[in-house]
Structure formats: structure tokens, C-alpha cells
């Protein structure tokens, strides 16, 4: 990877980078234990291991001073009443932040820190979201037919800690209801 300035484009309507180094596809099976309705999860997985989201990474060295960038695409859909979402993560270097720019679609960023504070922010095109150090974060697509597409940037040495979220999930869930989209407490969170 050359140490030179570079550019890339995000051609519309897909907004997939003109250049990327890694394409990650996360399917339903990768989020085992993360959806509230375990029966709906099992039934859906039995039918098909549905593609929930994709990440297009533009790699840089995993070193202080570098910035890693990319595009996250969360597809529309639900497991039971819960919208499709990313796995969510803390950074392995907890004291590192991340910035997201929503390019397309609608959704939420669910965030929490180890001290128990929770914040859920709405995402819509043009909205910039700053995730401070120490905050786990997960993107949730609430669009009915449109992908939630975000551009992200974070320090090269931050790494990812998916394991903590896999063990206990997030404290808040984004659910569909007859009254519309609701943010609810995760009833299983304290049981883990």
C-alpha cells in the first residue's frame, strides 16, 4: 500500500467506492443471539442465510496517525419486529472515536459505553454522527425498501472488539410496532 495521497469516488445511486481493498458480507448467521425474537431468527435462517449488511473497506496501515475509511450498507428487512442491523462493536483501543456520514436511507445508530450510558441517534442523508471514544456502536436500517448507506472514518490503530457485544448485546433495541418505530430496553440484557 503506497504512502501517497489518493482519491476515490462514491458513484450514485449505489455509493460503492470506486476503489476498495476489502468487501465484507455479513449474513444472518453472523448475528446469532443478537435478535430478540429467537424463534423468528431460527425460522428465517432455516429458509435462507439472508445478507444483512456489507462493508467496503479502504485499508491503511493499522497504526497511529492513519485513518481507515469505508462504506457500510445495511439492507432493509426485519427479524420478527427488529430491524436489520450491524453486529456492532467497541474499538479494541477503547479510547478511539469514529465519525459517520449518512449518505442514503434512514435508520439509527445505537450507542453505549461501559459505564451504562446509552444514546440512540437518528441517521438520515447528510447527517454526520460523532461516536466518542469508549462508545460501542451499531447501525440499524429502518428504511422499508432502501439501504442505509454510511461513510465511516476512524483511527488506523483502533481495531474492533465484537466479542463484548456478542456476549451481552446492546441495552437498547430498535423495533417496529403498530405505532411505528420504537426504541425499547433489551429485556435480555441483564440476564447475560
Region locations from a protein language model:
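Short beta->alpha connector loops
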Residues: 114, 134-135
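Active-site region of the double-stranded beta-helix
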Residues: 17-121, 140-192
Amino acid at each position: 500500500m503506497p504512502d501517497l495521497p489518493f482519491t476515490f469516488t462514491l458513484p450514485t445511486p449505489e455509493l460503492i467506492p470506486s476503489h476498495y481493498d476489502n468487501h465484507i458480507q455479513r449474513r444472518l448467521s453472523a448475528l446469532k443471539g443478537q435478535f430478540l425474537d429467537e424463534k423468528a431468527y431460527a425460522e428465517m435462517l432455516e429458509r435462507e442465510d439472508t445478507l444483512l449488511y456489507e462493508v467496503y473497506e479502504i485499508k491503511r496501515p493499522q497504526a497511529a496517525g492513519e485513518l481507515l475509511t469505508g462504506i457500510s450498507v445495511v439492507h432493509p428487512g426485519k427479524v420478527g419486529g427488529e430491524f436489520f442491523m450491524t453486529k456492532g462493536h467497541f474499538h479494541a483501543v477503547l479510547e478511539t472515536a469514529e465519525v459517520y456520514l449518512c449518505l442514503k436511507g434512514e435508520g439509527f445508530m445505537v450507542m453505549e459505553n461501559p459505564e451504562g450510558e446509552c444514546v440512540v441517534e437518528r441517521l438520515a442523508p447528510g447527517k454526520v454522527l460523532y461516536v466518542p471514544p469508549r462508545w460501542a456502536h451499531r447501525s440499524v436500517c429502518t428504511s422499508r425498501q432502501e439501504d442505509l448507506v454510511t461513510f465511516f472514518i476512524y483511527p488506523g490503530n483502533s481495531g474492533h472488539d465484537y466479542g463484548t457485544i456478542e456476549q451481552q448485546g446492546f441495552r437498547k433495541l430498535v423495533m417496529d410496532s403498530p405505532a411505528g418505530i420504537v426504541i425499547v430496553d433489551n429485556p435480555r440484557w441483564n440476564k447475560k
